[in-house]
Amino acid sequence: MRKFWRTAVAAAAVLTVATAAQAGDPDACKSVRLSDIGWTDITSTTAMTATLLKGLGYAPKIDQLSEEVTYTSMKKGDTDVFLGDWEPSMTSVRKPYVDEGSVVVLPDANLPQGAKYTLAVPQYTWDKGLKDFADIAKFKDSLQGKIYGIEPGNDGNGLILGLIKDNKDGLKDFQLVESSEQGMLAQVDRATRRNDDIVFLGWAPHPMNVKYKMQYLTGGDDSFGPDFGAAKVYTNERKDWASQCPNAAKLIANMKFSVDMENTWMDKILNGGEDPAKVATDWLKANPGALDTFLAGVTTVDGQPGEDAVKKSLGI
């Protein structure tokens, strides 16, 4: 009986090892295509994810796409993963694709708390009395009738255009200035150097909250949402990708971030001029304990221990 028991235990151990070795993903899953819409927070989280994928033997490919193109690309099967679904502001953009089933939203936010997204002003403009959306029109002359947004097609820009179109708070004669995140911040730099009034899209996490003395406007609940556009950021995947590539999908589901993490990464990218991939690598080397969470239940693409492989790729 004892001999039988030892044999059974040994067989179970062999089966466990064999099962682990057989994990991983099919060869077709080796290429993982991610969208980066050009916001520094999404650039940083996408770079972190790609660094881990690479360490696991995958071949991540990051494409610079707009929001709309991201969703049409997922629908066509050309993009697998998008880490930048800011909610509730992006609901109208993603909704048609989610409703038809071509895009899947992971149930748990990758940034569950601390995010916000609404209009903001420099502290000195706020001190003059521009504290609410309803105050913007009163400052039309000093604002030169302009509100500064980011890239064309962005959801925040769309909300501003809606305010202008509907003459919400008397904004019908205002102009939305569209450019990019960096372009908008250049305008904020210029205005703050001169103490000129300016209204712009602000959000957290982002180094702008440290670099500038700024305030978020009240009164935007109907457009940007309550609590100064309080937001959560979700991960989206193309239909069936998780079932086709379950190991890579497990990593993606594990990718959860904090405001402090993202602020650190973005500061190095925006203010330090560092490459996002280098920022990710350096941070992981300095914080190897994060691998326990990111890589829980994840193997390499060919089924070997995931954490060992990533540590080797990082040189730790």
What are these regions (language model features)?
Residues 30, 40-41, 162-193, 199, ...:
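An extracytoplasmic/periplasmic, membrane-proximal ligand-sensing/linker region
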Residues 72, 79-84, 152-221:
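Ligand-binding pocket segment of bilobal, Venus flytrap-like solute-binding proteins
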Residues 26-41, 58-63, 144-148, 252:
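Short, well-ordered beta-strand elements
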Residues 22-33, 54, 137-144, 294, ...:
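Immediate post-signal peptide segment of exported/extracytoplasmic ligand-binding proteins
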Residues 116-127, 230-244, 267-268:
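A bilobed periplasmic-binding-protein/Venus flytrap-type ligand-binding module shared by bacterial periplasmic
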Residues 102-152:
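A conserved helix-loop-strand patch within extracytoplasmic ligand-binding domains
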Residues 49-56, 140-174, 285:
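Ligand-binding cleft/hinge of the Venus flytrap
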Residues 1-23:
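Gram-negative bacterial Sec-dependent N-terminal signal peptides
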